[in-house]
């Protein structure tokens, strides 16, 4: 938005609405210190629907972190924590670097389709992210479950949430299946935006679960992903329809 810096405060509020304040409360219930701010402000939403973006230019930069896979048997990942694979959190060597990319792609795919992150945490804390992985995808491998130092702050031994939960997190989000239902914005097969009867919801869940398999060797390759049911029956046909629509009704080039 090239004209954003030139907006006055009133013009900014008129275009993007008033700031949203939320009171700050301490986890232990005690009153805040005198120097602490009484409120936090939600970030301003600058996003727009994808179908309203004209001629988007995607610029990719590796920030000097890319590497040649065959020549780098155990790379150091520079992936942001929210999108990092679980093996990186547990300090295991990245021996399947393409599998790490598949996990990251799966997390991104969910966010693109769902309009919100799959693993929602405060300040991208590593332990909160691990807990969200388990909450969404199920029990991790035993070696990770047993070696997780702060597991007792989240889960009982049987995998249930601790009753006296004191982390800055929200342990109420459902499993991946329920999140996909919520993403479909409907509570029945008739009102859900997914083609539930035709198998779209199931096929999408199968795709995402495969991409976010805890064990790296169990994740599909990129070539295998292209042959998954969701890609063949829904993603590719939707892409072809979109290309046909663009060729029939070219987007207005004026901004």
Predicted regions and their residues:
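Intrinsically disordered, low-complexity regulatory segments of kinases
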Residues: 1-255
